[in-house]
């Protein structure tokens, strides 16, 4: 991270690098990793110092792991200590800064609401259909809550286009009535 780089400048640099990224250029990859990790450190500090939210404190207790090969934007691995915030920086870094903050908070809320353990409990056989349905339900629960918060004090974040909400579940499954701001159990 360049000395004195602010979060917006570093985010812009990460996004510019994504557009020209080459897996074959080891020096570029090294610089990109450094910049992305620096950006992530600034995200932690922003969430703590500017927003005094538990999200930043949660991130401080985690290790960042970058996976350039993953198809997933981000996730949290709880089977390691300290827990790992796993991200594909080429995907996560391409979002706007407000969307990136939303995604980080989204992943943390899955842990706060114990969704990983609940998924294992409800789907011990690892059925992929149940896994997908659980993810939809858990995402709707988390995103509705984040959207409700973002109307006020949490306006520093913005839901990415296409994110799952109770409204999108209503449309996807042709439901006549569905309540917002419910737990995953309601949507599952």
What is the role of each PLM region?
Residues 1-102, 108-188:
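Short, functionally important secondary-structure microenvironments
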